[in-house]
Amino acid sequence: MDVSNTMLLVAVVAAYWLWFQRISRWLKGPRVWPVLGSLPGLIEQRDRMHDWITENLRACGGTYQTCICAVPFLAKKQGLVTVTCDPKNIEHMLKTRFDNYPKGPTWQAVFHDFLGQGIFNSDGDTWLFQRKTAALEFTTRTLRQAMGRWVNRGIKLRFCPILETAQNNYEPVDLQDLILRLTFDNICGLAFGKDTRTCAPGLPENGFASAFDRATEASLQRFILPEFLWRLKKWLGLGLEVSLSRSLGEIDGYLDAVINTRKQELLSQRESGVQRHDDLLSRFMKKKDQSYSETFLRHVALNFILAGRDTSSVALSWFFWLITTHPTVEDKIVREICSVLIETRGTDVSSWTAEPLEFDEVDRLVYLKAALSETLRLYPSVPEDSKHVVNDDILPDGTFVPAGSSVTYSIYAAGRMKSTWGEDCLEFKPERWISPDDGKFVNHDQYRFVAFNAGPRICLGKDLAYLQMKTIAAAVLLRHRLTVAPGHKVEQKMSLTLFMKNGLLVNVHKRDLEVMMKSLVPKERNDVVVLNGKCNGGIGEGVAVNAAVAVAV
């Protein structure tokens, strides 16, 4: 190498080093390395990524900026990532400047093959049209009733018998896998009216369910790889891209058959005047003012399955784990359930487990809803979400975000900040969701509690999710006491969804309801039973009551 080239190389390295020193001082948060940016730290902390992000946010006051590619001209644009958990910043992104923070091209490219332009993967007018159409359906009581039927049938005929078998045989069961199967069956029933039967004795494999899981896994892997690399693998037919292609073929074939059959059924129903189908797919197909393509209908079903399956199953897994480590909370929940059932079904405990809880019974379980909400605060099903910045903007805390960069809001960290939730923010404390004045459930600000998203994109199925979670939780806790299997280690799986890495292996024990009933009904006076620690309230509004309350029997 001649002298001129050597001097040029030294000058380039020196210029880069000066630039790097300047940008390192400008960025705050995790350490930034030359060229690689913050990627080394991200890789090093991959097994505890969400806690690591939370620690950095605490140290930086709720917002920090870093770069994943420390290269001039990229570090402050495409390579720049702003990370925040500040409620004001989250409200700014998800509501105030909603149009400036879409999902963006990266997200859409990753999920396009799987979800197309469905509601979960679209922006702008495409998203708005589907949102308005779906919102009309989610406000109907008939959809809630349909969800209730699928949930209760699955609990009674499959879920509870499997748990009872595990109890009788003294065998541990992976509760996360079992709940995931149950919620998958439920959401498929609600989405397109088909029983996938994945939660059945023997836990059979279902071709559609397996293809759906493989397609989800392959799509999520694309987030880890640079776009040019996964596109190259797709073009060459390598790795999980092969699995994705095959799985999508199976999914499309299954749903096309469902759609074609449903079209014929709906045609016959119109001719006979009998309406039998109330699933989401049928509701879209029955709209007289629209004619949807099979591709659109297929994506409608897939988007709602993806959005609706994991939220409930992941939340319930963490809920049951927390319950095993907080016996006082468990006792309060069981007492609340039993108190409601004494009112609605009497003191014969055999009637309590004969059928799953009905709407009016589930609606009155205030403390249970508080415990589930507290679970979602600490362990949100989707721990991090990201938005693309369309135009230069300044967040409410003064952080400048340039066009072309991305902003990640940490839902996990938002639930663990002392500035938002107090000094006891890391404690599992359902009481923070109950008003000390009247015992009613407290709905915290949606930009502090972001487990169901917020703003125009807030989860349409939030109420259905609570209905499903409360019904399943009540069914389990009413019949069983759970303990984590000896030696089983509960860890977070680093994914877009906060699954447990090793599942949740539990031992199932029988709950003695007679003892609980006697503690709630200690004595009788004439025809009045005195209840201790009951939940009282009208249908649709729960009131947690600690004092003894007399009710006629």
Swiss-Prot record:
SUPFAM superfamilies: Cytochrome P450. The chain crosses the membrane at residues 2-20. Its EC number is 1.14.14.1. It catalyses: an organic molecule + reduced [NADPH--hemoprotein reductase] + O2 = an alcohol + oxidized [NADPH--hemoprotein reductase] + H2O + H(+). Disruption phenotype: No visible phenotype under normal growth conditions, but mutant plants have reduced content of cutin, loose cuticle membrane ultrastructure, show increased permeability to water vapor and display enhanced disease severity to a virulent strain of the bacterial pathogen P.syringae. GO terms for biological process: defense response; fatty acid metabolic process. It comes from Arabidopsis thaliana. GO terms for molecular function: alkane 1-monooxygenase activity; heme binding; iron ion binding; oxidoreductase activity, acting on paired donors, with incorporation or reduction of molecular oxygen, reduced flavin or flavoprotein as one donor, and incorporation of one atom of oxygen. Belongs to the cytochrome P450 family. It is a single-pass membrane protein. The gene is CYP86A2. Expressed in leaves, stems, flowers and siliques. Expressed at low levels in roots. Expressed in guard cells of cotyledons and leaves. Heme binds at C459. Catalyzes the omega-hydroxylation of various fatty acids (FA). Acts on saturated and unsaturated fatty acids with chain lengths from C12 to C18. Plays a major role in the biosynthesis of extracellular lipids. Involved in the biosynthesis of hydroxylated fatty acids required for cutin biosynthesis, cuticle development and repression of bacterial type III gene expression. One of its GO terms (cellular component) is membrane. PANTHER family: CYTOCHROME P450. Its cofactor is heme. Keywords: Heme, Iron, Membrane, Metal-binding, Monooxygenase, Oxidoreductase, Plant defense, Transmembrane, Transmembrane helix. Induction: By abscisic acid (ABA), auxin, wounding and drought, and in etiolated and dark-adapted seedlings. It is found in: Membrane. This is Cytochrome P450 86A2.
